[in-house]
Amino acid sequence: MTDQRTLGSETAIERDVVVVGAGPAGLMAARTLVAAGRTVAVLEARDRVGGRTWSKTVDGAFLEIGGQWISPDQTELLALVDELGLETYQRYREGESVYLAPDGTRHTYTGSMFPAGESTIVEMEKLVALLDGLVAEIGATEPWAHPAARELDTISFHHWLRQHSDDEAACSNIGIFVAGGMLTKPAHAFSVLQAVLMAASAGSFSNLVDEDFILDRRVVGGMQSVSETMAAELGEDVVFLDTPVRTIRWAGDGGTYAEHVPGTPVTVWSDRLTVRAKDVVVAVPPNLYSRISFEPPLPRLQHQMHQHQSLGLVIKVHAVYETPFWRDKGLSGTGFGAHELSQEVYDNTNHGDPRGTLVGFVSDERADELFGLPAEERRRLILESLSHYLGEEALHPVVYYESDFGSEEWTRGAYAASYDLGGLHRYGAHQRTPVGPIRWACSDLAAEGYQHVDGALRQGRLAAAEVLGAGSLTGAER
């Protein structure tokens, strides 16, 4: 052990398992292992738990900076929320929604389908039906194994939509649900197969486009409280904050992962602790794997695969007002506009709060452009966009905040990782393959619940089950 490798780790401890990352996946893995009688150390680089779920008070307003919504199919998360004694509440959705058409005209409507014109609606329904068919045929568990996987993974979602419809408004509107709303990448940057996985993880594409389904409920006190409650149960002798992991080493010089013998000691070096264990669960997104030195190095396939997984980019905008003024106008606060700066807006008022909160989203290339502007200009343009949906009152919030996970050292994007064109069918089957004593767990690798807290919890539980020797869970449980 050299001075360089220890990196200032002055305290050495022994545990059965080290978990890297104290987000929902890592904490669920730790919780499952501790319940089975294993000793665990959870090492978290940040000064908080929760990963990409994060709540904080800004100028007196409680804001959910990260992930926040629960849909009815997210049974793993719903069961845990109940078990932890937490409560949920429905997103406000009474009144009319607003659709901003490509020509800039404003339309109010009720129901789930935009008032985009009869012919465009017909085309949108056709595209949704085609995607629902692919979802039913391919599923979320092993999309790369489908006979048409290569074909569907080597054409962009943008071009596939336009192969099946010549209605540009229909293509743009359907594209927004996956591109802007989920993967936060331009529709030309990911494949149809990746879009199908995203939809299959929610049960169907119809579910994905139904905001009353996919954005159904929130946790009272914020989604981060799920992780905070799990961490509090585990205790400070299990969860270590401000502890970025630098090196994971299990063999002497010349060792290979192919030679790994279960139970071989693993040493994990961090800035604060050196931990000796038998197994490791890496519970951070794939774009951060390269922040860790692995000794021996990861296999070639892993090195290549991780370079084809990246996070998107989105600005989550929070605007707080003295009252939810849009409700007085008979509006729900929900708005969509594929060509608008903020492509979506929702009523995000907190439980029991007399003030009103709007949340809007500016994704991918639009976010790039805005981040090149001074903060005040960015704020002006975003609020102007919100006003197009809900009126001039939106220009004057009492609190304004932009979530920017792209600049976070230990996140570097939002919402989650996806493959570039051709990557999913090429590498998907290998993304959870254990490497020696190391297992992987995060929402980015999930089937059901992909990119969501529910998927993170499923992955954490699955990794723990593998460590415990329980074998793989069934595809339906993943």
Swiss-Prot record:
PANTHER family: AMINE OXIDASE (PTHR43563), AMINE OXIDASE [FLAVIN-CONTAINING] B (PTHR43563:SF1). It comes from Kocuria rosea (Deinococcus erythromyxa). Disulfide bonds: none annotated. The gene is puo. The keyword Oxidoreductase applies. It comes from the Bacteria. Belongs to the flavin monoamine oxidase family. It catalyses: putrescine + O2 + H2O = 4-aminobutanal + H2O2 + NH4(+). This is Putrescine oxidase.
